[in-house]
Amino acid sequence: MEPLPGWGSAPWSQAPTDNTFRLVPCVFLLNLLQRISAQPSCRQEEFLVGDECCPMCNPGYHVKQVCSEHTGTVCAPCPPQTYTAHANGLSKCLPCGVCDPDMGLLTWQECSSWKDTVCRCIPGYFCENQDGSHCSTCLQHTTCPPGQRVEKRGTHDQDTVCADCLTGTFSLGGTQEECLPWTNCSAFQQEVRRGTNSTDTTCSSQVVYYVVSILLPLVIVGAGIAGFLICTRRHLHTSSVAKELEPFQEQQENTIRFPVTEVGFAETEEETASN
């Protein structure tokens, strides 16, 4: 039995083909482009509100009321401790930054309605993160380690630059700009350890001890001999002088004795006459 007209099998298949899947992304992109093209293109000094382009507010102001078909944008000044640095469509001004001393920061320029606070590093620190003239993070200047000296001192935007000590000099580290020369051991000292770029030469005083221990007894013996010779010479000189003076002493004694004898003889004669 033949099927009725119009009740036969369909001339097309209901199963999706590869071409159908390829059309889906194209349709999606087409709709997206239509939506983008439907939005108005605002100028640089305007901002988009719905389907309208509204004029931006000047630096130091914020949007109090957006524009409409019959009115423009209503702007208001930024309250204290807030600012806007550029033309904007912001409903609120931005809060002023705070320079935290615990982060090594100090206030370089106070905040205004059109400019944020400018922070710089306190002395002894340098800026690690710089945004124009504003610094957000500071680090302490590097201290040169032993064996190095300060070649260039740190500033508020640059760290300390260190350089190695040359041979014959040393540094204990720190903030000194010049390395110190090694100590030269004297003629009576011995070099125990040669200096390095971080330590000085070490000298020994044992040689001095040996020299003193040898010279001191010699000096004592020499002084004793010299004293003995001086005393002996003085004794000999005294003896020779005494011998030379003996005749004069005897003559003087005889001269003194004669008057005594004469006086005694005269007294005897007087006593005899009186008797």
Swiss-Prot record:
Lineage here is: Eukaryota, Metazoa, Chordata, Craniata, Vertebrata
Q: What quaternary arrangement does the UniProt entry report?
A: Interacts with TRAF2, TRAF3 and TRAF5. Interacts (via CRD1/TNFR-Cys 1) with CD160; this interaction is direct. Interacts (via CRD1/TNFR-Cys 1) with BTLA; this interaction is direct.
Localisation per UniProt entry: Cell membrane
Q: What disulfide bonds does the UniProt entry report for this chain?
A: C42-C53, C54-C67, C57-C75, C78-C93, C96-C111, C99-C119, C121-C138, C144-C162
This protein's gene is called Tnfrsf14
PANTHER family per record: TUMOR NECROSIS FACTOR RECEPTOR SUPERFAMILY MEMBER 14
**Transmembrane regions:** 211-231
Family (UniProt) = Belongs to the tumor necrosis factor receptor superfamily.
Q: What is known of its domains?
A: The cysteine rich domain I (CRD1/TNFR-Cys 1) is required for interaction with CD160 and BTLA.
Question: A single Pfam family, by name?
Answer: TNFR_c6
Q: Which residues form the signal peptide?
A: 1-38
Q: Tell me what PTMs the record reports for this protein.
A: N-glycosylated.
Give a brief account of the tissues where this protein occurs.
Expressed at mucosal sites including colon and pulmonary epithelial cells. Expressed in naive T cells.
What's one GO-annotated cellular component? plasma membrane
Tree of life domain: Eukaryota
The yes or no answer to whether the keyword Lyase is present is no
Q: What does this protein do?
A: Receptor for four distinct ligands: The TNF superfamily members TNFSF14/LIGHT and homotrimeric LTA/lymphotoxin-alpha and the immunoglobulin superfamily members BTLA and CD160, altogether defining a complex stimulatory and inhibitory signaling network. Signals via the TRAF2-TRAF3 E3 ligase pathway to promote immune cell survival and differentiation. Participates in bidirectional cell-cell contact signaling between antigen presenting cells and lymphocytes. In response to ligation of TNFSF14/LIGHT, delivers costimulatory signals to T cells, promoting cell proliferation and effector functions.
Q: Which UniProt keywords apply?
A: Adaptive immunity, Cell membrane, Disulfide bond, Glycoprotein, Host cell receptor for virus entry, Host-virus interaction, Immunity, Innate immunity, Membrane, Phosphoprotein, Receptor, Repeat, Signal, Transmembrane, Transmembrane helix
- GO BP annotations listed: adaptive immune response; CD4-positive, alpha-beta T cell proliferation; defense response to Gram-negative bacterium; defense response to Gram-positive bacterium; innate immune response; negative regulation of CD4-positive, alpha-beta T cell proliferation; positive regulation of cytokine production involved in immune response; positive regulation of T cell migration
Quote the protein name from its UniProt record. Tumor necrosis factor receptor superfamily member 14
